[in-house]
């Protein structure tokens, strides 16, 4: 086994993950800014890269030399789901340190000005006056629903037998296809955070003392989570919105009833990031636009090209599940 053989077993989302890890690591290494987590960030990215190669070797290549080796199910889960762990517990939290590596918070004033023009007053004052406590709680529930929604759609594609075995591009998309799209949307948003840095209204306008919302258990849950995982930056576009729309848009072709049943929740989630003042209004709009651009790009350049080359059957080994991966 050599690195070239190992590289051919990487799926697109594995390569996107490794590419993003080392793009940001190189930015940090060569940045003139004083970044006190520089060494920790580079070492953690190197460790994640090694993990990806090791887990792929043990799940997909070790059996070629050890004929009777069958990777346990938990090991396959770690191999297939690893990007969601990095999004949740590592990468997003780095933006407090990454967001100003290239540019200042130049677009914030335009985002703030648009909100003032749209509402005729500071939005947090409008929200406090016009949104009742039950509305705040509804928005908090919608904001929280991002987590079970993303994991739920991902689990559907992972557990669906048709999604595992389908090879016809007009049929059910596979788990790997879905993860490729999800990771592409995550990493694209992360790059946009670096190219167009902006802080949330709570940070840019110092709303901690001014914004007094009255909600229920979901609002307090979200507020507690934000106290621990909130980052300074990563506002434009909203990845919360973009990734949700990307996930739900995959249901359009084959599961239209599910798509429409989720749409009220998705619309509420899109609005919630503004009502709770974790984002500007344009962040939400940009998140939706970004998701539709991703969907157009995927259909135009990935699916259509694969169909033209293979006559409707996918044949890219890096993006296909191996025989041992999901069975």
Positions of the model-derived regions?
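Short, intrinsically disordered terminal tails adjacent to the first/last structured region
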Residues: 1-8, 13, 304-327
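Interfacial helix-loop-helix junctions of multi-pass membrane proteins
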Residues: 200-204, 235, 268-294
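Transmembrane alpha-helix/helix-exit interface in multi-pass inner-membrane proteins
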Residues: 93-109, 185-211
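N-terminal transmembrane-helix/juxtamembrane module of multi-pass inner/ER membrane proteins
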Residues: 3-50, 75-150
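Interfacial segments of alpha-helical transmembrane regions
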Residues: 77-85, 151-196, 204-205
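Membrane-interfacial catalytic/cofactor-binding modules of polytopic membrane enzymes
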Residues: 191-254
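Membrane-interfacial alpha-helical segments at the cytosolic side of multi-pass membrane proteins
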Residues: 152-159, 241-259, 289-298
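Aromatic-anchored segments of alpha-helical transmembrane domains
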Residues: 21-30, 186-194, 266-275
């Amino acid at each position: 086994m050599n690195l070239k053989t190992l590289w051919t077993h990487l799926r697109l989302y594995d390569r996107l993950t490794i590419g993003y890890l080392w793009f940001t690591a190189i930015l940090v290494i060569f940045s003139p800014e004083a970044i006190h987590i520089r060494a920790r960030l580079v070492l953690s990215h190197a460790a994640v890269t090694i993990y990806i190669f090791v887990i792929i070797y043990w799940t997909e290549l070790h059996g070629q030399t050890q004929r009777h080796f069958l990777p346990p199910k938990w090991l396959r889960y770690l191999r297939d789901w690893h990007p969601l762990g990095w999004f949740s517990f590592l990468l997003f939290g780095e933006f407090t340190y990454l967001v100003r590596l290239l540019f200042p918070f130049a677009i914030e004033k335009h985002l703030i000005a648009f909100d003032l023009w749209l509402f005729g007053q500071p939005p947090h004052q409008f929200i406090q006056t016009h949104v009742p406590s039950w509305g705040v709680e509804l928005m908090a529930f919608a904001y929280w629903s991002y987590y079970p929604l993303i994991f739920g759609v991902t689990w559907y594609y992972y557990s669906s037998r048709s999604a595992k075995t389908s090879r016809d591009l007009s049929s059910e998309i596979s788990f790997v296809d879905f993860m490729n799209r999800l990771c592409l949307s995550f990493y694209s948003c992360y790059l946009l955070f670096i190219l167009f840095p902006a802080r949330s209204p709570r940070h840019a306008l110092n709303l901690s003392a001014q914004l007094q919302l009255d909600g229920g258990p979901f609002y307090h849950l979200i507020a507690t989570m934000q106290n621990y995982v909130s980052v300074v930056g990563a506002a434009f576009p909203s990845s919360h919105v973009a990734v949700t729309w990307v996930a739900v848009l995959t249901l359009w072709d084959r599961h239209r009833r599910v798509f429409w049943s989720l749409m009220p929740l998705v619309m509420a989630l899109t609005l919630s990031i503004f009502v709770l003042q974790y984002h500007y209004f344009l962040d939400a709009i940009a998140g939706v636009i970004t998701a539709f651009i991703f969907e157009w790009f995927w259909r135009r350049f990935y699916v259509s090209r694969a169909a033209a080359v293979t006559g409707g059957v996918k044949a890219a080994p890096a993006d296909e599940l191996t025989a041992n991966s999901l069975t």
